[in-house]
Structure formats: structure tokens, C-alpha cells
Amino acid sequence: MKKTVAVLFGGESKEHEISLQSSISIINAIDKKKYNIILIGVEKNGKIGIRSINNYILFKYNINYIKLAPAVSYLYIIPGKNNYQFYSLKNKKMLKIDVIFSILHGSNGENGAFQGLFNTIYTPFVGSNVLSSSICMDKDISKRILSTFGISVVPSITLYYENYKKKINKIINNIKFPCCIKPSNQGSSFGVNVANDFISLKESIDVAFLYSKKILIEPFIQGREIEVGVLGNRNVISSVCGEIKFKKIFYDYKEKYISKKTKIIIPAKISNEISNKIKKIAKLAFISLECSIMARVDFFLTKNKKIFLNEINTIPGFTKNSIYPKLWSKSGLDFKSLINKLILLTIYKK
């Protein structure tokens, strides 16, 4: 009997549109001979509803206009150990789901919120648990923990919105330029800026606080951006390393999803020694933060060969431009095989 996979996409975060694009690739890749599919769109206001396989996203291939198609039926969630997890309001039917494949990026999707919801309905889901998801989403907390395992991370100053005005003058005196200002719990480079002087620093702080009540100020690292994919539960494997080359001073939202000038080089043109070291650190970070199923780990590699772990993404992108599936493709696991592998890892997770 075929198992039923529910794909969740959309969400309330700033990365709503990226999630929609990722869902297209995943839905196309799921083996329909092996699995039944239920498409669940999460609207920007948080409403959850079933979408038709024939009409689930409008303006699919335009990042500026892409949006969820109207729901076929909104859903109630049924908590507890039940045979059914969702109730359809339109046709009054209960839905049984065996696996949840959530591609909800960012806050209230990648930060443990929905992972906790999945736990309340006792349904296995692709990705890390509540704790790991929450930690990895918070750049400040994840860096503190990774440091205790001897992993080099970019040093940072943490500012909280409620009291930063009392500390800002003292902090500014200790900052060297250029520096990078970023929200602690956002993805896709939302709210991230590089400051070269005190005026741009204060402006960048104000922008970052629009996205989060906690922000980080880091020294700007002049280096190459190297990324590696991690896959597994107890037996963790890593992909080849990839490098992202871009025109701007840093890899911002436009460079990630709009610019056609960004280049992805796989495998990265680095020595075997550096490559193996980065892959080893990626797996150590994945295990140290108790991640599971999948993650993309991002690094900076400086001219003098210093390696800094930048961040861990527990729900990496799956768009046509995303590096995570490309890394695995170059490692011998094509897109459809990768999606099937992720589902099987979830089903047989212990």
C-alpha cells in the first residue's frame, strides 16, 4: 500500500515565495508510483489549506508575482495519536498522512514551530527536530554552541532591541570596519548589510531590527563562500564542496534568487586537504547540534586558508537555482533520488 506524503509550502515568513519555488521542484520529483501526495499550502496569514495538484501555485516561474493558488479546502489539525491528522472543512473528511515534507523556510517554519506541531500529531517529518531546528535558526545561539565543540565561527556582538540604545555608543567604539550586520533569526540574507562607517552602521542596525529583536554585528570576512550538503541520521554523509561566486560585496537576496550573474562552481576549486577539512567540520556541526535528515552548511574560506563556519540551514532551498540539490547531484545523487532518499530516511528514522 502506498504511503501518503504531505508537502507543506508557503508560510508566514519573508521567505514565503522561496518556499513556493522549492515546492515546485519537490512535488515534481516525488515518485507518484511510490507515494500519494497531499499538497498543503500555508498562507501568509497562517491559514492552512489543501491545494490541487493541477493548480497549487500561480505565476510559478516569476519570483516577483508567484503566489499560492486558492485553497480547495481549509484544514483543522487533529492532535494526538490518531489514525488521521487533518480534517477537511469542505468535504468533512479526515486525512491520513504518513510523512510530512515541509519546505517552509524561515520563521514559523524552520525554527521549530511547525516541527513541534508535527510532534503533536505524531507524524514523522523530513528534517531536524524541534530543538535542533530552533538552535540552527538562531545564529547567535548556534555559534555559541558550535564554539564549545572547537568549531571556528565568525565572532560577533549581540544586540537586543529593548536595550541596545543604552549600549550602542560603547559598542561602536570597539567595532572595526567593514562589518556585517544581520538579524539573528532570518534566512535568505533578509535584513543583512555591510557597513563601512558609523553612519551606515547605525542605518544597518535599524534595518536589521525590522526583521528581528536580536541582531549580530560581525567583522566582514573577506573570503570565498563554500557550501556543503549533509545527509543522514546516525550515519551522516557529506556532499562534495561547492563555491558560490557573486558580483556584490556579499551574497544577498538578489544574488541568491534574482541575479543571473551568480555562479555556482561544483566541485569547488580547493585542495583535497581543505575540502576534506570542511566536510569533516560540516558533519561535526550537524552531529553536535543533533540535526537529522538534511542540512546545508555554509563556510567562509579566507586567503590564508582559515575556515569559518557561517551557518547551518536545516531546510535548505530546493529551487532550480539552489545549491543543495546541485551538490548532491555532483556527488552521485540526482534530484529525484535525493527526494526519495529524504523521505526514506524519515520513514526509517529511529
Swiss-Prot record:
Highest taxon of the lineage: Bacteria
Pathway(s) where this gene product acts: Cell wall biogenesis; peptidoglycan biosynthesis
Coiled coil residues, start to end: none
Keyword tags: ATP-binding, Cell shape, Cell wall biogenesis/degradation, Cytoplasm, Ligase, Magnesium, Manganese, Metal-binding, Nucleotide-binding, Peptidoglycan synthesis
Protein name: D-alanine--D-alanine ligase
Co-factor(s): Mg(2+); Mn(2+)
This enzyme's EC code(s): 6.3.2.4
Major enzyme class: ligase
GO terms classed as biological process: cell wall organization; peptidoglycan biosynthetic process; regulation of cell shape
A GO term, aspect molecular function: metal ion binding
Family: Belongs to the D-alanine--D-alanine ligase family.
Binding-site residues, Mg(2+) 1: D298, E311
Catalysed reaction, written as an equation: 2 D-alanine + ATP = D-alanyl-D-alanine + ADP + phosphate + H(+)
Record domain ATP-grasp: where: 143-344
Primary location recorded for the protein, binned into one broad class: cytoplasm
Record localization: Cytoplasm
Gene Ontology cellular-component annotations: cytosol
Keyword presence, Cell inner membrane: no
UniProt cross-references to InterPro entries, sorted A to Z: ATP-grasp (IPR011761), ATP_grasp_subdomain_1 (IPR013815), D-Ala_lig_Van_CS (IPR000291), D_ala_D_ala (IPR005905), Dala_Dala_lig_C (IPR011095), Dala_Dala_lig_N (IPR011127), PreATP-grasp_dom_sf (IPR016185)
Cofactor remark: Binds 2 magnesium or manganese ions per subunit.
Annotated positions binding Mg(2+) 2: E311, N313
Keyword Protein biosynthesis: no
Binding site for ATP: 172-227
